[in-house]
């Protein structure tokens, strides 16, 4: 078991739901990322999803696109993201970290080199948005051989063949995309999410995290009733964009309110 498995199993045993926040590495400033990660933990994060900035983030809405642009403009690279995780690990050996991003930077580094460097930095899992599960056997094998969980997205439109590949290759948890479209879009239908997550559980034994469209404590609590984990990203990145130097304190306060609602 890696840190993700241990944390999610402990939460399940305690009857609690996991809170998984997302931020983009290097936004608003590279020097602030590790402080933001610690602020998320103080606010109640169980797992941190750390976004790898990318020039063409096709699955992301305007808020996270702008975050990627800001981070890239400040010189962020995949290697620097790994340095940030290593910096976080110097004072937090326990909170699981999942890298979320696109395949191109990983391919540029090489699967094995990336997996080795990620593991050495203290990464626990990798979610590669544009890597189809049914084409991911080699990639998943390399990551898993280095002790990294392979997290995959599933959606209401995921076909049976792809779902079968996810069931075979996924580790850690599965990220259910609760609405069609890009991150930060639309309003989700909690009743529909409940039906879809119930159907997913017939095929998957891993914990199910739900993301896309969760913007406040009330929605997070409702999703927590039907899922194992609540993933929140665009709302936090929006807060970072508005808060500037106050981002760590603002993020901690925002997440603490969501944590309180989940535990109510």
From Swiss-Prot:
GO terms under cellular component: cytosol
Gene3D superfamilies reported in the protein's UniProt record: Aldolase class I
Record field: catalytic activity: (1S,2R)-1-C-(indol-3-yl)glycerol 3-phosphate + L-serine = D-glyceraldehyde 3-phosphate + L-tryptophan + H2O
Domain of life, per lineage: Bacteria
The UniProt record lists the keyword Lyase: yes
Enzyme Commission number: 4.2.1.20
Keywords tagged on the record: Amino-acid biosynthesis, Aromatic amino acid biosynthesis, Lyase, Tryptophan biosynthesis
GO MF entries: tryptophan synthase activity
Annotated metabolic or biological route of this protein: Amino-acid biosynthesis; L-tryptophan biosynthesis; L-tryptophan from chorismate: step 5/5
Pfam family, one: Trp_syntA
PROSITE patterns reported in the protein's UniProt record: TRP_SYNTHASE_ALPHA (PS00167)
Coiled coil: none
Enzyme's top EC category: lyase
InterPro entries registered for this protein in UniProt: Aldolase_TIM, RibuloseP-bd_barrel, Trp_synthase_alpha_AS, Trp_synthase_suA
Active site: residue positions: 49 (proton acceptor), 60 (proton acceptor)
Membership in a protein family: Belongs to the TrpA family.
Role, per record: The alpha subunit is responsible for the aldol cleavage of indoleglycerol phosphate to indole and glyceraldehyde 3-phosphate.
Subunit structure: Tetramer of two alpha and two beta chains.
Protein's name in the database: Tryptophan synthase alpha chain
Protein species of origin: Laribacter hongkongensis (strain HLHK9)
Lineage, top ranks: Bacteria, Pseudomonadati, Pseudomonadota, Betaproteobacteria, Neisseriales
